[in-house]
């Protein structure tokens, strides 16, 4: 479970009810739209809580808590986690388990904002491409990446740059902060074969392909 924020449909409980799969929580940083301390309620069920070190969470089972910073790699059983950087707070996660690789960007994105000073936007661009240059994995099974509506015309800049560097079998749009993302003609022209999942509402579920 990455960056548990809110679950109005109680989907997590439903998914866990009849599942014997191991449960891991990942928290990329402390922002309220990425970190909900209510994740403690699954403390007995969860195998581990893997979090950026800027997240404060008290637990009865402190041994289940693992704090990371960008550059760290952690192995728990058959799970290998590498934390990459962010262009806001915290970090991003690359997770390998059971022959599958998942990337979750957290707040890693090309944060270009209309109306901000040009120097700030240029610095944001530089920081984003610097983080991308660190990625060694060129193919992943699933990638979760922001497409933030508040960025207006720059909404797709980050995800398109990411897709130039990494080829995910499935791209999951997240962090919409407004109107649901509908890929532009330019995006579809550049990436006509890219499989997408763009959730329509909180609680949407997609069955993963084996």
In which residue ranges do the predicted regions lie?
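Beta-strand-turn-beta hairpins that frame and shape the catalytic cleft
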Residues: 1, 73-82, 94-102, 207-210
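Pre-active-site segment of Zn-dependent metallo-hydrolases
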Residues: 1-30, 37-42, 108-137
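Active-site environment of divalent metal-dependent phosphoester hydrolases
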Residues: 8-9, 30-35, 55-59, 74, ...
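Metal-dependent catalytic neighborhoods of phosphoester/phosphodiester hydrolases
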Residues: 36-46, 181-188
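Active-site-proximal loop/helix segments of hydrolase catalytic cores
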Residues: 87-164
